[in-house]
Amino acid sequence: MKKSNPWFVFFWITLLVIVLMFINFARQGGNEVELEYSQFKQHIKAGSVFKVLVAPGLIRGQFRDGDGVFKRFKTVPMDDPNLVKDMEDNKVLEFSATEKSGWLGSLLLNWGPVVLLILFCFWMMRGMSMGNKQAMSFGKTKAKLAVGASKKITFKDVAGCDEAKEELQELIEFLKDPARFQKLGGKIPKGVLLFGSPGTGKTLLAKAVAGEANVPFFSSSGSEFVEMFVGVGASRVRDLFDHGRKSAPCLLFIDEIDAVGRHRFAGIGGGHDEREQTLNQLLVEMDGFDSKEGVILIAATNRPDVLDPALLRPGRFDRQVIILSPDLKDREEILGVHSKKIRLDNDVNLNVIARRTPGFVGADLANLVNEAALLAARNSQNAVNMKNMEEAIDRILAGPQRKSRLMSDKEKNIIAYHEAGHTLVAKFLPSADPVHKVSIIPRGPALGYTLQLPEEDKYLTSKSELLDKLSILFGGRVAEELVFSEITTGAQNDISKATGIAMRMVTEFGMSDKIGPMALQRPNEEVFLGRDISRDARHSGKTSELIDEEVKNIIYSSKSRASKIIKDNVSILNKIVSYLLERENLSGEDIDKIIKGEELAPLSESSSVDEETKKKSTVEKKVINEKVIIS
């Protein structure tokens, strides 16, 4: 319900008071001339009275004085039975009589404004009182209570992360039957910290624990504790734990706890920082409540490195559960959970989709299924097919297609050679991931892309794999140089990635023969976390020169490998470009056939490439076959 504006109410009350006062003033007569009754009779006989109102106890009217000025008058009536006859004889234009007014009307007109002013003052004081109550409510927690929800989340709704479920199963058993643990003298963890990459399902897992245990679930965000008023955060922490004790057994969940639990400052800002006060109160509360009370705190973050050590010590967050990105088996299970909500065609293979989505977390997979459903609905399909799933993967990885972007034939050739260079180098390097798809259709910010997908989940990367990745990144630039004797800005992102990989190989991974296994680069930590007030150099200037030299050697040697592969396979490069300009998309199987010297099957009539594109690609194919590659 919309609250009324107090100034709006104030305006109307003031206006009403003014109107009543004006009416009362008009009723009292304002600047009226008081006449004796005899004078009143004389004016009637003189014919100067033209309006008379006879009321009980008072006569009012208007007359014209000797100067011809109209004036209002009043007089006290006498017992005069000839008054009406005299007014008729002297042609008084207007005269009337009124009945005796009631005491209620007189009281309203006389005391109404005063009563309204009193009521207005009372209303203002009441508003101030409510304002004080609202100010006091700042200290109340904003945690949302979920109990007996119609859509209860359980472990069946959380696919994958089996190890995390096992770690949390003890909490569920304790919340269901705390006496079994207390009888043996065991103590259940007071707090559990869930940490992992964004989108891995930390919040969903916490809700599933509450759903499995069937206990109240208070959920809050770390940012909700800190407000503009000092002391509000600490008050909300106290109120949250008070609610938990009253509803025990229950779960308290704080999402993104790094917003309030960051490492305390090293004297900067003093001890009165609001976030620090809130953290101190949280530490006190976690010490103050006993695990026997049946209140368990679960927190989630994707930045455990910035949390205060006092928050992570035993007795507070006793158990820390890492939620890893799902592997192949987990991804297939997650896809199965989300695909239950949509209608799938028979050609959809969730195992194939899971293999094509390495690195995808739960949120990415949920988005993939939803994107595929939207694409199917856009095409008025009855079910989601495999083509929709593959297009959804491309949209997530590279962005939506930008078919409306018009490019000249020259730029299209450059992009085709650039992507063909990446593809060719990737196919001839032993440690490179297989090429899944290459396209010259603009997607998102990219004008074209080469998609490589690993055959299995990897947790380690070898030096040879990194060197091959560098050569693949330079494949596009090398192809441009050899074919057009010109370089463009299209390789900007490739060069940036390659430089970053080479720098980490030298300074972090210890993969330089000259420098050796030394960590020369400080990890990515934020300044002012109470750990480092200033950055100090971890190596000398001479070592910095050596680092630059080693990075340069790695980059140039990788580029030379890419150049040799492309020069030795110019004919294959031209064929890949020819088919790319004709079809715009090539699969990994198509690339394998081209390298083997096989011809690709002609485009079907239902292909999305129109006749004009086919004619243009034929002309471009002739130009490509006649092009001379400069060694």
UniProtKB/Swiss-Prot annotation:
Residue intervals passing through the bilayer: 6-26, 103-123
Binding site for Zn(2+): H418, H422, D494
Pfam families listed in its UniProt record: AAA, AAA_lid_3, FtsH_ext, Peptidase_M41
Molecular function in Gene Ontology: ATP binding; ATP hydrolysis activity; ATP-dependent peptidase activity; metalloendopeptidase activity; zinc ion binding
Keyword hit for Nucleotide-binding: yes
Any one GO CC term of the record: plasma membrane
PROSITE patterns to which the protein is assigned, alphabetical: AAA
Keywords annotated in UniProt: ATP-binding, Cell inner membrane, Cell membrane, Hydrolase, Membrane, Metal-binding, Metalloprotease, Nucleotide-binding, Protease, Transmembrane, Transmembrane helix, Zinc
Enzyme Commission numbers on file: 3.4.24.-
SMART domains the UniProt entry points to: AAA
Residues exposed to the Periplasmic side: 27-102
Subcellular location: Cell inner membrane
Topology of the protein relative to the lipid bilayer: Multi-pass membrane protein
Sequence ranges on the Cytoplasmic membrane side: 1-5, 124-631
Alphabetical list of NCBIfam families matching this protein: FtsH_fam
Subunit structure: Homohexamer.
Protein name per UniProt: ATP-dependent zinc metalloprotease FtsH
Lineage: Bacteria, Pseudomonadati, Elusimicrobiota, Endomicrobiia, Endomicrobiales
